[in-house]
Amino acid sequence: MNMKLIWFNTLFLLIFTSCSGLLSSKENTPYVYVSVDDNDYENMEALQLTKVMGNGINLGNTMDACGGGWIGFKKDPLEYEHCWGMPETQKVMFTAYKEAGFDCVRIPVSWLNAMDIANGDYTIDSRYINRVATIVNWALEADLFVILNDHHDYEWCALFGPEETREEAYRVFDAIWDQVGTYFKDYSYKLIFEAANEQWGAGFYHAFSIGGKNYTSDTEVSVWSSSAADFTAFQNKCYDIIEEIGQYYVDKIRAQGGKNVKRFLLMPGYDTSMTYTADRRYKMPQDSANEDIKKLLVSVHYYGPATYSILSEDAGWGKVANSWGTAQEVKEQNEDFAQMQRFTNEGYGVIVGEYAVAMLKQSDGTYVRKNDDIKWMTNVLDNCDKYNYCPLIWECNDYFKRGWKRVKISDWESQDVKCELGFVDSDVAELFKSRSYAVEKAALTSE
């Protein structure tokens, strides 16, 4: 989402940040984490998984931050981890997530930070993948399920659209998932692989640049102003590509062996839109390695209405909204979530991988909570409880403080300083504490 770049303008001067944090740049190889209760998950169905995953949180704007444009590629992992304004990730953050009522965490990653594909280097820097593994281990040790994906990554998925760049797209795709999949193939079943973020769909035809090399698509320019018939044809093409690479992904991960044969795999929806994903043109892959058990899930995001959940201030495409909750707005949200029953009815798990209410920007440049945010989030969580979806809030040190924050100390330097750890506001804390799997399970048992 564009909202993930909210820090970009304000943090441009911090691109040469200090890396004198708590993590040494010295390379360390983490151990392979295996849960003591892994046997419970080996033969678990996707619909059982989404129930025990409870509700979760994203480690946003952290390992997904893209800094290659000014930092370069294959640098110290902390340079990317800091470059969108987030503090260095610490183990204590994950125990705090668990104590706050979260049962799962999504760790978005931009792997191309650690590669240099513009110059033909497709090997992930070992320091970077080891840093990701350290963070994954901390989350698993805190008894959290973990979703690990390929996130922004400079929008390279646009290579899948035009036929002339599709071969290169598969080269990048193979490089990422051959290395990531193999690295984590013996990890606990509580680690879930998500094939991509929001790029599967219209993102196949998105102009982008990486490493000084520009990729453009005439389709991107024309599609939004095209006729309804042309737009339908464009979507049909995107649905076909999703089906092709989705199947390719499942077959690839299963063939890696180890626990990847039965690992839960999360498939991105079309633009992660509930409406486009619920469309019958979207097809889930076949999972021939698990014909008698459902191990696949589908990922969608929820930011609606956009003027309320995405905008922090007025934009060219809309005026910021600071209230939500009319009968019509509630009805529309409920209808959005009801669409995804198409998948649960077929035995597939549904992950609402992101949802959030943007903070409201004040005239002095500070940000405050919007009116009715608790009402909006409560209704989202109620819908997820009703339909057995697993929701994960998009979080970037806003509602939930990570114990550290990144602070500018000069024009060219910043550092991490201590701050609160956990939810700052009691109403938000209570909302999520009451939605943990343990609390909801206890409530059902007592009925």
Give the ranges of each region predicted by the language model.
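An active-site-proximal structural segment forming one wall of the substrate-binding cleft
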Residues: 37, 84-105, 115, 120-152, ...
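N-terminal carbohydrate-binding accessory modules
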Residues: 25-104
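Aromatic-rich peripheral "rim/lid" segments of glycoside hydrolase catalytic domains that contact
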Residues: 362-447
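Surface-exposed, active-site-proximal loop segments in enzymatic domains
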Residues: 69-78, 111-130, 153-169, 201-220, ...
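Catalytic domains of carbohydrate-active enzymes, especially glycoside hydrolases
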Residues: 88-110, 336-344, 383, 387-390
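Active-site region of glycoside hydrolase catalytic domains
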Residues: 170-329, 335-358, 386-389
